[in-house]
Amino acid sequence: MTLHCIVVTPEETAFETDADSVIVPLFDGEKGVMTDHAPMIGRLGNGTLTLTTGGTTESHYVEGGFIQVLDNVVSILTNRVAAIEDFNRDDLEVNLRDALAMPGNSVEQLDQREKVVDAVRSQLRMLNRS
Protein backbone atom coordinates (compact mmCIF):
# COMPACT_ATOMS: atom_id res chain seq x y z
CA MET A 1 0.00 0.00 0.00
CA THR A 2 1.25 3.51 -0.82
CA LEU A 3 0.39 7.10 -0.06
CA HIS A 4 -1.22 9.27 -2.70
CA CYS A 5 0.45 12.70 -2.60
CA ILE A 6 -1.15 15.80 -4.15
CA VAL A 7 0.79 19.08 -4.26
CA VAL A 8 -1.22 22.22 -5.04
CA THR A 9 -0.12 25.85 -5.46
CA PRO A 10 -2.41 28.87 -5.88
CA GLU A 11 -1.94 28.59 -9.65
CA GLU A 12 -2.27 24.85 -10.29
CA THR A 13 -2.04 21.28 -9.14
CA ALA A 14 1.74 20.98 -9.38
CA PHE A 15 1.79 17.18 -9.33
CA GLU A 16 0.17 14.02 -8.02
CA THR A 17 2.13 10.86 -7.32
CA ASP A 18 2.19 7.74 -5.18
CA ALA A 19 4.94 7.32 -2.59
CA ASP A 20 5.97 4.95 0.17
CA SER A 21 6.87 7.85 2.46
CA VAL A 22 6.69 11.63 2.49
CA ILE A 23 8.80 14.00 4.59
CA VAL A 24 7.60 17.60 4.86
CA PRO A 25 9.12 20.72 6.43
CA LEU A 26 6.73 21.87 9.13
CA PHE A 27 7.24 25.34 10.58
CA ASP A 28 8.77 23.76 13.70
CA GLY A 29 10.65 20.77 12.24
CA GLU A 30 10.31 17.92 9.79
CA LYS A 31 7.50 15.36 9.80
CA GLY A 32 7.58 11.94 8.19
CA VAL A 33 4.41 10.28 6.92
CA MET A 34 3.98 6.63 5.96
CA THR A 35 0.95 4.53 5.07
CA ASP A 36 -1.84 4.32 7.66
CA HIS A 37 -0.62 7.49 9.39
CA ALA A 38 -3.08 9.05 11.81
CA PRO A 39 -5.09 11.94 10.36
CA MET A 40 -3.34 15.28 10.82
CA ILE A 41 -3.14 18.86 9.66
CA GLY A 42 0.05 20.90 9.89
CA ARG A 43 1.51 24.24 8.92
CA LEU A 44 4.43 24.02 6.49
CA GLY A 45 7.61 26.03 6.67
CA ASN A 46 10.15 26.55 3.91
CA GLY A 47 12.23 23.53 3.02
CA THR A 48 12.54 20.16 1.36
CA LEU A 49 9.59 17.94 0.49
CA THR A 50 10.99 14.42 0.11
CA LEU A 51 9.06 11.62 -1.59
CA THR A 52 10.40 8.07 -1.46
CA THR A 53 9.11 5.24 -3.64
CA GLY A 54 10.97 1.94 -3.61
CA GLY A 55 14.61 2.99 -3.53
CA THR A 56 14.03 6.24 -5.40
CA THR A 57 13.96 9.60 -3.63
CA GLU A 58 12.58 12.77 -5.18
CA SER A 59 13.10 16.19 -3.57
CA HIS A 60 11.24 19.45 -4.08
CA TYR A 61 11.40 22.86 -2.43
CA VAL A 62 8.16 24.07 -0.83
CA GLU A 63 7.52 27.52 0.57
CA GLY A 64 5.00 27.58 3.40
CA GLY A 65 1.44 26.33 3.29
CA PHE A 66 -0.40 23.41 4.87
CA ILE A 67 -0.43 19.61 4.88
CA GLN A 68 -3.38 17.32 5.47
CA VAL A 69 -3.04 13.56 5.93
CA LEU A 70 -6.22 11.49 5.75
CA ASP A 71 -6.86 7.91 4.58
CA ASN A 72 -3.41 7.50 2.96
CA VAL A 73 -3.81 10.75 1.00
CA VAL A 74 -1.26 13.50 1.65
CA SER A 75 -2.55 16.88 0.44
CA ILE A 76 0.00 19.68 0.37
CA LEU A 77 -1.11 23.24 -0.28
CA THR A 78 1.92 25.48 -0.72
CA ASN A 79 2.75 28.95 -1.98
CA ARG A 80 5.51 27.59 -4.21
CA VAL A 81 6.97 24.24 -5.24
CA ALA A 82 10.09 23.72 -7.35
CA ALA A 83 12.32 20.79 -8.24
CA ILE A 84 15.77 20.76 -6.69
CA GLU A 85 17.27 20.90 -10.20
CA ASP A 86 15.75 24.37 -10.65
CA PHE A 87 18.21 25.89 -8.16
CA ASN A 88 21.77 27.10 -8.73
CA ARG A 89 24.06 27.57 -5.72
CA ASP A 90 25.84 30.63 -7.15
CA ASP A 91 22.54 32.37 -7.90
CA LEU A 92 21.26 31.58 -4.41
CA GLU A 93 24.38 33.00 -2.77
CA VAL A 94 23.91 36.23 -4.75
CA ASN A 95 20.23 36.27 -3.74
CA LEU A 96 21.21 35.84 -0.09
CA ARG A 97 23.70 38.73 -0.24
CA ASP A 98 21.06 40.91 -1.90
CA ALA A 99 18.45 39.92 0.69
CA LEU A 100 20.78 40.68 3.60
CA ALA A 101 21.43 44.11 2.06
CA MET A 102 17.72 44.95 1.85
CA PRO A 103 16.74 48.01 3.90
CA GLY A 104 15.32 47.47 7.36
CA ASN A 105 14.12 50.92 8.32
CA SER A 106 10.60 49.85 9.23
CA VAL A 107 8.84 46.82 10.67
CA GLU A 108 7.44 46.01 7.22
CA GLN A 109 10.89 46.16 5.60
CA LEU A 110 12.38 43.99 8.35
CA ASP A 111 9.59 41.43 7.93
CA GLN A 112 10.09 41.34 4.16
CA ARG A 113 13.86 40.98 4.52
CA GLU A 114 13.45 38.17 7.07
CA LYS A 115 11.01 36.34 4.78
CA VAL A 116 13.36 36.52 1.78
CA VAL A 117 16.45 35.56 3.81
CA ASP A 118 14.61 32.58 5.34
CA ALA A 119 13.47 31.35 1.93
CA VAL A 120 16.94 31.61 0.36
CA ARG A 121 18.63 29.94 3.34
CA SER A 122 16.10 27.09 3.13
CA GLN A 123 16.91 26.68 -0.56
CA LEU A 124 20.65 26.57 0.19
CA ARG A 125 20.09 23.97 2.94
CA MET A 126 18.16 21.86 0.46
CA LEU A 127 21.06 21.99 -2.01
CA ASN A 128 23.56 21.12 0.74
CA ARG A 129 21.56 17.98 1.59
CA SER A 130 21.45 16.71 -1.98
Feature-to-residue mapping (PLM):
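Compact, glycine-rich, soluble single-domain proteins
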Residues: 4-97
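N-terminal export/targeting signal detector
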Residues: 1-4, 129
